[in-house]
Amino acid sequence: MNIIDISSWQASIDLAAVFANNPLDGVVVKATQGTSYTNPEFSKWVSWLDKNDKPYGFYHYLDGGDANAEAEHFYSVVKPYINKGIPVADYEGDALVKGTVWLKRFLDRFRELSGVKPMIYCSLSVVQTQNFSALTDHPLWIAQYADMNPVYGFVDNPWQKGSVAPFNGYVMHQYTSCGRLKGYDGNLDFDKFYGNRDAWDGLCAGENDTSKLKPADPQIVLRTLKNEFGVNEARRNALRAQGYDPDSVQETINRLYAVGGNVKRDIGKDLSYLNSILWIVRSI
């Protein structure tokens, strides 16, 4: 899914025009910052997105002050939209000095209030230099850019390099801050969400405990064999966004090749054939 994220820096944006003129799927809106700031455009934008049934999220820019107070301020503003949009903790700037123990306090307090585990947004370099081992049950949204050149229109497979360990993957990638779309005269953050609308709505509804991924089933294996989810890290991210354990899916595919020969060649669109092969695999 093609996503943009916006703040008051894009106050002049006409969401209706941008959606009408581009293959845009959804928007993440800045809601709050610190313990008192609220984006003056937040209510207008989110109300429009909600009314028009567009996928959306909302983020809190962490200032690194009182973690509980920041979570409470965020919740007080986004409360009407809980379970409708994805909540995000924007971990950058001054908050980085406080570290992930502080971040966990914010995340835990917001979850107490809302019942939803927020997504974590940060740069890939932060994931690689700080200890996120206690936070891997939160969905991850990374920022990593190939360069700072203008990007005209969305990219299907944005460049990404480097591990996100200890996370098993990420569900969204901000790949430029210099994106350009028809209907808006300015730079935009472009993001790729590795999932469909159902996966997005699942994250809104609190179904974002990534420790509860489903094992492989015939339908998801068939879709994977048909290359619906891409390859390598993109595939893992997409499967996780669909709610499936990518390791279970890959293990099943490996066993299918071992038992069934050239499964990808033979399987075609025949789900009954795949079911029969899976029955053999499970019987071993």
Language model regions located:
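Repeat-associated, polar segments at repeat-unit boundaries in modular proteins
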Residues: 240-263
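Short, low-complexity, charged amphipathic interaction modules
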Residues: 263-284
